[in-house]
Amino acid sequence: AMLLQAMKPVTPYEMGETEVPGMYTISIDGLGSKPVEYTVQLPPDYDPYRSYPCIVALHAEGKSPVDQIQWWCGNLNKRMNMRMGQAGRYGYVVIAPKWTRDGKTNYGFTVHEHAAVLLSLRDALKKFSIDSDRVFLSGHSEAGTAAWDIGLAHPDLWAGVIPIVATAEKYIGRYWQNGRQVPFYFVMGEMDGNQLEINSGEFNRYLQRTGFDTMIVEYRGRGHEHFQDEIHHLMRWMRAHRRAFTPEKFTCSTLRPWDNFFFWVEVDDLPEDSIVMPIMWPKQNVRDVEVVAEIVSDNRIRVKTAANKITIYFTPDMIDFEQRVSIYTNSSNTTKAIVPSTEVMLEDVRTRCDRFHPFWAKHEYSRSR
């Protein structure tokens, strides 16, 4: 694990001369045969032996990934031959995936859109030196809605989520419990139609219930805008937040088969009557699948969920590998030795691309049907 942390990125990107120093557009394999493209802007004097915080910035409808790079990093100063914006000043790597579907401008809550964002992040973790505990997700307008949804669906990935003029739609209301696990910073305008009314149900949950870290900023007399004047406050907020990688206790919900990894628990084979694909929305009388997990004292782990397959991953922060571990999964109880495995560790780094927090071992459980 220490060797993995000390390594440079696994497949460092060959950085040649570009028109804008430190900006590269990269194409990778997406789902199926469709490639995914993302643009990355590195901070000045980028050094692969250091680790940098990161912003995954999703562009609004009708905009491009470069527009998001410019929002966070500023325009190119031709005299200085560098961008002079806030992200570069604070040493952030900015990743801007081309997440929209061909011919579509609205966010569809689909697996392809999630994959475009998550695969871009994972590829960037392979190629660039990114601090995986300080990765923030942001988006404007429809992309703000996407950031809100993806942030709730995959709360284990983010140090914080920044939806700007976003709308609470579809799964966002059903995944509200997941919001306890990730900080949110919302920005909106008072005159932006009835956005506050639409979002008020979720905002009330986040502000009135315990365990949420939520900031909501409303600009008086302003409408549906990009709100770049908020960027200094955003930088201060991000500086104060880091991801909690192995929370001792969490409850998360899922309705989609690809929203199945939460911190140190992976679930598969969800009950058919609890799956709602985006094209089927709204589906009546559907109960989401809850994943309730807890690290208890004395080397005990508890996981309860309606999913039929559970994989629990372990790190030294969670258990003492020299002692036997008691694992409670649904109605099954077992006490066994959990042995660290190099194979598990390397496979985990290959798939999740998180060199700073590899899992050392895993335990698999399948419910008998």
What residue spans do the PLM features occupy?
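Active-site machinery of serine-nucleophile hydrolases
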Residues: 54, 58-126
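A domain-start/cap signature at the N-terminus of enzymes
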Residues: 1-52, 333, 339-356
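C-terminal beta-sandwich/jelly-roll accessory domains of carbohydrate-active enzymes
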Residues: 258-369
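C-terminal catalytic histidine-bearing segment of alpha/beta-hydrolase fold enzymes
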Residues: 193, 197-300, 305-309
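Short beta-strand/loop motif that positions the catalytic acidic residue
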Residues: 179, 185-188
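Gly/Ser-rich "nucleophile elbow"/oxyanion-hole loop immediately N-terminal to the catalytic nucleophile
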Residues: 44-50, 104-141, 157
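The conserved beta1-alpha1 loop
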Residues: 53, 58-60, 165, 188, ...
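Primarily recognizes the serine-hydrolase "nucleophile elbow" in alpha/beta-hydrolase
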Residues: 125-126, 133-180
